[in-house]
Amino acid sequence: MEAFARSERSFEEVMRFYLEMRWMMSNQYTMKIYPAGSGRDVYRNIEICCNSTLNQLCQIILESFDFIDEHMYEFCMDNRMYSEYAYQSDPEGDEPSADITLDEVGLCKGQKFALHYDFMDDWMFTITVSKISEVQGDLKPCIVKAKGSIQQYPD
């Protein structure tokens, strides 16, 4: 009977360890970003953690294309500018804010949405969630692959 009690304790310890490890796991999104009008010659692949916000996603996208972050933007979940299904960088009233985590948005593999940046120049970036992986801890956003370039302010 004593051996059985020890094995139960051992099972409980294993389960507690497993649950603690699961608690420390989080989703990491791999995304492919294309600027509109550039075809398939210009894109970026980025990885970003589920606890990052849409604001942080915008920052890494702009950084990856060497853009200066100095304008308002919105994430268009239906790929249309000024849509009611958008998260705003500077919301008015009860509009949804881009200060929401990626997990709260509820992204899924294969989902496409857009970043509309600079409402005067109307930069559009198509974002595709290409992969969702489980990782341990929160990783910083990073640029995994870059192809081609564009200029924010062409001559």
Give the positions of each predicted feature.
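Short linear regulatory motifs enriched in tryptophan with gly/pro/ser
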Residues: 1-155
